[in-house]
């Protein structure tokens, strides 16, 4: 590291490198001379963008490009329970079906999901697992599409993208024929409370009538699980750029989804961001925060 144009005197330096613990250093600069220093940095458990990583609460992340890390799972019951315990945030109402800690949390609004991200950012910065220039948040609508392998037009609303969605699923173009590709309203859900018999996928059995443990089905090529089914996932955007009433966006379908058009990768569910439901959950991303312009 070469630093030029320093004024003579004692200089305090803070060395920061992804994947290593920060190090404080003092050097003395003398007019007309070169000051040299040798420093050994200690490896940390902090994030290195571009590499698979596990954070401080055992959430696993996979890279998407150079500046974004994606949680490979939907946020779990255990993750959210820790958030409630440490922050005092109001706990979601219990699901009307049994869930274990490794199931996706449900009955959370977009506002709840944002609060979780803010808490996790503060927690991980304090533990020096992420830098002050990193933050957890919900994925944008466009980022979610990229996560699921779908390239869509930038600069337009999720509502426009929804109206012009392609007839493709995260696993391909064919409707599942016996192969377990996700947790939907299947034969195991036929007739259970909350699912009508005529609102299931005939001939398909994923083995889970309600939510499934995260990661129960095969991941996509990025190593991400459950991008179709299990729970619908909140994203950051509003459904329309203009409108009197704000509508949030949910992606991916859920355990009660049975209609083909609602399982297309480009399908969106537009609901008020304060709504909570037993099919609503979320996953988080870790992003580099752009520097503020002067």
Predicted regions and their residues:
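Extracellular and select intracellular beta-sandwich modules with Ser/Thr-enriched
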Residues: 22-24, 35
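Short, structured beta-strand segments at or near domain termini in extracellular proteins/domains
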Residues: 278-292
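Functional-site microenvironments in short loops/helix caps that host divalent-cation chemistry
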Residues: 99, 110-268, 278
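Short, solvent-exposed S/T- and G/P-enriched segments that are highly enriched in secreted/extracellular
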Residues: 1-7, 25-26
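Short proline/glycine-enriched turn/loop segments at secondary-structure junctions
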Residues: 28, 269-276
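Short beta-strand edge segments in extracellular beta-sheet folds
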Residues: 27-32, 40-42
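Residues marking the start of alpha-helices
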Residues: 2, 71, 101-104, 135, ...
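A short glycine-rich, aromatic-capped structural motif
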Residues: 7-8, 12, 17-18, 36, ...
